[in-house]
Amino acid sequence: MHSDELLVEILVEELPAQALLNEYKEMPKKLHALFNKRALEVGNIEIFYTPRRLCLLIKDFPLLTQETKEEFFGPPVKIACNNEDKTQGLNALGLGFYQKLGLKDHQHFQTAFKNNKEVLYHAKIHEKEPTKDLIMPIVLEFLEDLNFGKSMRWGNVEKSFIRPIHNICVLFNGENFNDIEVKEYGFKTKQATKVHRQESFDFIEVDSPKAYFEVLEKNHVILDPKKREAKILQEIKELETEHHISIEIDRDLLDEVVAITEYPSALLGEFDKAFLKLPSEIITTSMKENQRYFATFCQKSQEESPTLHNGFIVVSNAINKDKQKIILGNQKVLKARLSDAVFFYENDLKKPLDNAPLESVVFVQGLGTLKDKMERESIIAQYLTQKYAPSLNMPLEKALELVKRAVQIAKADLLSEVVYEFSELQGIMGYYYALKQNENELVALSLKEQYLPASENAPLPSSVFSAIVALSLKLDSLFSLFSVGKIPSGSKDPFALRRLSFGLLKIIAHYGLEFDLKADLKSLFEKVGVYQSFDLEILEKFLLERFNNLIDCNPSIIRSVLNTNERDIVKIIQKVKALKRFLDDPKNAQKKELLFSAFKRLANINKDRNPNESSEFSISLFKESQEHALFEAFNAIKTSAFEGLDSKIEAYFGLHAPLEEYFKSVLVMDKDIEIQKNRKNFLWSVYQSFLEIGDIKEIAI
């Protein structure tokens, strides 16, 4: 037998769920790196967790290390020996090389060639050694490599970790790993584990991976998080069937309850129906954020919107048989939470949205208050309303009035008691308060949708009206924060400006709104007139960089369009997609190299050209028939009215044949300077026309 199963359990105090889940994804990679570092070839690696333990299970862990050779290269022989033919031995420099390696016999030194030079050389052979001596150092290095964001110290221990470590249990090939002192964390190892607290508080000895799994299973610890998740989902499904309800599975919440339980049980509790008068989002948010409960809904047909049911699912970690006691305890806690929510909500309803003291809340240091932000957004919103009036299906005067009102009260709910308690309900509570205070329904809905989209694939504002309010918020935040230098760099983006920018582009693209990233940004910056001066090209470039996330496409095609003067968001997307369609077309896929060879040459000829240089040319100076042929084909395109981008691109790429013939027969760098200049100007004109679609030199095929 050359290998055996290795199991390592790291027993800790309760791990914070979110920190554990974030780092769990990185653990296999980090463990693999430690094995590779020591040239250990192992089998499958599995990592399990519960709130109290990390378990590393490695199949086919070798009993012995591999024999390895370590090579050392010293100084060149000609400066390390007393003479060039090496007969008089080593000088001080040569002796120093071997002394550093701890070698005393220098009589029979070796040499090797490195970088075409003969140098002193020594090879050290590392014999096979038992791997059992490597296990604890690997585990301790693994613990140091883990990054949970925060760590703590306890007692007089040397090292820190996210929570105190109580034991490291190593089970491998019947070896004894008891009583190894781990000074770094202040304990001695035991080949033992702990089980569910309701079963025992004591260590239980184990002598093999098989015994370890049996002990946990018998004592209500489900080690594998996938099995805990499956148990929860199965029990939820049974509750749905039994009680004729539907349960919305929140993925993040499910991951969290899996991470905080060792033996989960899904139980159904109820709350007083009187609480259903609250907006449903208050109830579901309170249940999720405060108690980690799943919301339940009345079962309806697929066409109907789900209605909140006065039930909740609590995932318990208890193993006692009296489930009703657990349910009653959770019902009591939820009742107190929802009673508080009713109090906050009713207090908020007494306060008119107009009266919210926005001037008392600082937006960002150096950027004024929420009232200042609201006033800036109002100017942006008026500009956008006039620009997109045809898409609003109402008279311009009415649209301007409603948009102004929406922006005026959009931030009022930030000062409400409910949003103070649940910040994720900003905008949503504004919607409910606006409806209760008889605001226009479009206005109310725009308050709810102003922060959309919340993530990459999240819903967008449901109308152009809401889109205008959402865009105003985003544009002001970008102008404001860029103007005071709060620009994202590297992984740092404290104001989530990348996500905000992506949302801005996605809204504009979805509704097909005209927005030029050069002209409109400049106009808005000047119209608002209160931002600190900064280079708008920095913001323009920042927004252009988001297109790679916006369009699923070969990045070089996106780059080719962005490398032109086109800055209208919708037109950029249309051109990228049209180029992609052309290049993906099976009839073009086989001849891409042929299509691009002439165009690449055209681009290379013009790569150093000054864009502002005159491109006038005269056909009277054309001497070759291929010049006339290319001009006629080019002129036919320039004077044609195309139905759309697809036919225009098809026509431009149709120039590849006359271009090929041109380059075969025409010498661009003619001895006659006038003819040379004329040919260059003509080719520049052809290239410039291509830039109406994309910069062909950027496209990688």
From Swiss-Prot:
Q: Name one Pfam family in it.
A: tRNA_synt_2f
State what protein this is by name: Glycine--tRNA ligase beta subunit
> Matching HAMAP family, A to Z?
Gly_tRNA_synth_beta
> What do we know about how this protein assembles, alone or with others?
Tetramer of two alpha and two beta subunits.
Kindly report, in one word, the top-level EC class recorded for this enzyme: ligase
Catalysed reaction, written as an equation: tRNA(Gly) + glycine + ATP = glycyl-tRNA(Gly) + AMP + diphosphate
Q: Which GO terms describe its cellular component?
A: cytosol
Name the family: Belongs to the class-II aminoacyl-tRNA synthetase family.
Q: Where in the cell is it found?
A: Cytoplasm
Name the PANTHER family on file: GLYCINE--TRNA LIGASE, CHLOROPLASTIC_MITOCHONDRIAL 2 (PTHR30075:SF2), GLYCYL-TRNA SYNTHETASE (PTHR30075)
Determine if Transcription is one of this entry's keywords.
no
Q: Which GO terms describe its biological process?
A: glycyl-tRNA aminoacylation
